[in-house]
Amino acid sequence: LVDLADNPSRGTAMPQHRPFAILLISGSALIALAGCSASDAATSQAASTGASSAQPVVVELFQSQGCSSCPPANADLNAIAGRSDILALSFAVTYWDRLGWKDTFGSPRFTARQQDYANAGRGEVATPEFIVNGTYAVLGSNRTALGSAIARAGAGHGAPAISASGSDIRIERGAAGAPATVWLVRYDPNTRAVPIRAGENGGRTLLHRNIVRELTRLGDWSGSATTFPLAPARESGLASAVLIQRGTGGPIVAARKL
């Protein structure tokens, strides 16, 4: 577990370990975990939530290749990444980079997103950490709590419909309340095996799926039907999704895989 984020606008602090029990596994055991434990704890519970591809439960994982506690959480996310009723997103933070290994997918923007959640009272800046629907913060080693949070999140009620056509994203009318932020997320849906050559995970090969590569703020939505331009991705082979989120680090009121 690591406290405090490295962000140009917020200063830096060295990661600090806190003691807690966690199982570290690798190789075939990691793959077995992805297929069994996470399925029992998180995936099966999500099946009864009523969520769908048109309004999935959003599960964000904040992790780092430099964090020895993160591989089991990565495996849990990988296990649910293919579900149509869940939008699983893996954000690589940067505050571990100075401890021997620079994360190959890390971005200060992703670190700042986790800090925004902490500032909004949703957990603390720590790795690994899950945030479910922008509302529930879950310690990344607690698979049972992750499954419970996914089940509590359920399907969105009264959320606006989101669609994409050609080069546009359209959000239909809905009850917005306060203006909400519209985010475009581009992520890699493939499983990537990354050899780690230094740091706490040095000598291991970590499996990543649904790694976020782009996070773009499209604008605000206030309840009326709105259209935003959909620019091409900077990388080929990326999947896209839209999030509608209240405030900074607030609840996610709607989401759609495009």
Task: Enumerate the language-model features and the residues they cover.
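Thiol-based oxidoreductase modules, predominantly thioredoxin-like and allied folds used
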Residues: 85-111, 124
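Bacterial signal peptide processing site
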Residues: 37-39
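Bacterial N-terminal signal peptides that target proteins for export
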Residues: 15-26
